[in-house]
Amino acid sequence: HGCKGDDFCDGDKDAIGRIAEYEASVGVTAIAPATMTLPVEELEQILHTAAEYKKETKDCRKADFLGINMEGPFISPAKKGAQDARNILPCNVEICDRFLKASEGLVKFIGIAPEESEHAAEFIREVHERVNVSLAHTNADYDTAMEACRAGANHAVHLYNAMPAFTHRAPGVVGAVFDNKDVMAEIICDGIHIHPSVVRATFQMMGA
């Protein structure tokens, strides 16, 4: 989302540049910043600004800007975390395409909570060849998450956080990810969001 006092959703090219320069200074060579759940029109402007930054910036001192990870607005109010519930929407193909257009194809991941729409599988089938679909900020149970994966969801963020806990009787989204080898998972390895033991176990199960 950001660092050093700058946020990707500031919608400011200079802020993106400072983020990219800081990341490069600590060894991160490429970034795909995440958005917050904001009004659609505001997100479109942020995405447009990012596309302009990408076209204008050729600086080896900055991390390469690979794309954008949209954590919202198609998420669950029950797992919204720091997101503003007033801006949460059910997944919508037209709005998704607006995001892709505004970003000039820079949006690489779009997060959804599949339990929040009876048309989630249809949405995934419609868009998954244009953008990677993530299970994100979701309260889905195992069966709902499995249906989303079968429809074409191929990514989960951030595994264990902002989703149901993994238990032996209710494996939830985490269990569905473990059961789908084509699904890539992102995890927050700061030792706070997830216990280091769980990070190690996840790498043992899923690999790098």
Which residues make up each language-model segment?
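Di-metal (Zn2+ and/or Mg2+/Mn2+) metal-binding site signature of metallo-dependent hydrolases
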Residues: 1-13
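Divalent metal-dependent hydrolysis catalytic cores, especially in the metallo-beta-lactamase
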Residues: 4, 17-46, 62-76, 103-115, ...
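Charged helix-capping and loop-helix junction motifs
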Residues: 12-15, 46-49, 92-94, 169-174
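Active-site glycine- and acidic-residue-rich loops that bind
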Residues: 40-45, 115-120, 133-139, 186-204
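Metal-dependent catalytic neighborhoods of phosphoester/phosphodiester hydrolases
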Residues: 41-52, 81
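Short helix-capping segments at alpha-helix termini
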Residues: 55-62, 103-105, 128-130, 206-207
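Divalent metal-binding pocket/active-site signature
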Residues: 70, 77-172
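Active-site-adjacent C-terminal substructures of enzyme catalytic domains
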Residues: 144-208
